[in-house]
Amino acid sequence: MNNIKITIQYDGTDFYGWQIQPNLRTVQGEIYKAVQKVYGEKITIYGCGRTDAGVHALGQVANFRVPKMLVPINKVHIALNSYLDRDLRIIKAEEMPDSFNARASATFREYLYIVHNSSTSFPFYERYAWFYRKNVIDEKLINEYARYLIGEHNFTSFCSTEDENDSKFRYLERVKAIRKGDTIYFIIRGNAFLHNMVRIIVGTLVEGQKKKKPINFIEDILKSEDRAKAFVTAPAHGLYFRRAFFKDE
């Protein structure tokens, strides 16, 4: 079997998330149909991260296996894109060892969250950033709060109550807010994420600085292991799966 890794970008606005669902348009489902048309095979697609409805991707990664390389590897992305709509694109394809699995082989996943912090919203931000005008966001204070998220913690307080993972422990390597003009970019990198985890982290950091919470308030929320202690879930449309990191990379 030939193991093919693909890097994917998509505008998540008109998708019901990554994972295949009956009678719904999903990213995994659309790629599956394109692979079937190119290779004539029923295959399994393994994705690095499961994005929710409305969430975008700049560098999502997936892999699938096919018995024959009917298309040269440098043309695979072109062949697949011919069966995909314009809001979903395969950026590149690579042949990988059989041991590679986009989900299991990833050591870290990195998300980007964009907040437009202005008194006026702009049409081109509507689908791609959280418009926040309640106050001028203090990114320096946010970065002080964020220090308490680094490392391994029980993130029960920072995930949906519908999350089905047995363990809520996750490791975060980086949580950083960077301001460029009226736009704030949150970069959050971890080994894995719980349902709505990034969006709840961003919403809690933003609302925390608005309320002028003490520096260690994040620590108290983590210790509570109670979703009700954290703040709002930031909107899906500001979130992007930015990239994945793999072993030996």
Curated annotation (Swiss-Prot):
Family: Belongs to the tRNA pseudouridine synthase TruA family.
GO BP term, pick one: tRNA pseudouridine synthesis
UniProt entry keywords in alphabetical sequence: Isomerase, tRNA processing
Keyword Chloroplast found: no
Record's catalysed reaction(s): uridine(38/39/40) in tRNA = pseudouridine(38/39/40) in tRNA
Molecular functions (GO terms): RNA binding; tRNA pseudouridine(38-40) synthase activity
EC number: 5.4.99.12
Annotated active site: D52 (nucleophile)
Superkingdom, natural source: Bacteria
Family annotation (Pfam families): PseudoU_synth_1
Subunit structure: Homodimer.
Function: Formation of pseudouridine at positions 38, 39 and 40 in the anticodon stem and loop of transfer RNAs.
The keyword Cell membrane is assigned to this record: no
Record-listed substrate binding positions: Y111
InterPro entries in the record: PsdUridine_synth_cat_dom_sf, PsdUridine_synth_TruA, PsdUridine_synth_TruA_a/b_dom, PsdUridine_synth_TruA_C, TruA/RsuA/RluB/E/F_N
Organism, as annotated: Brachyspira hyodysenteriae (strain ATCC 49526 / WA1)
Listed name of the protein: tRNA pseudouridine synthase A
Class of enzymatic activity (EC top level): isomerase
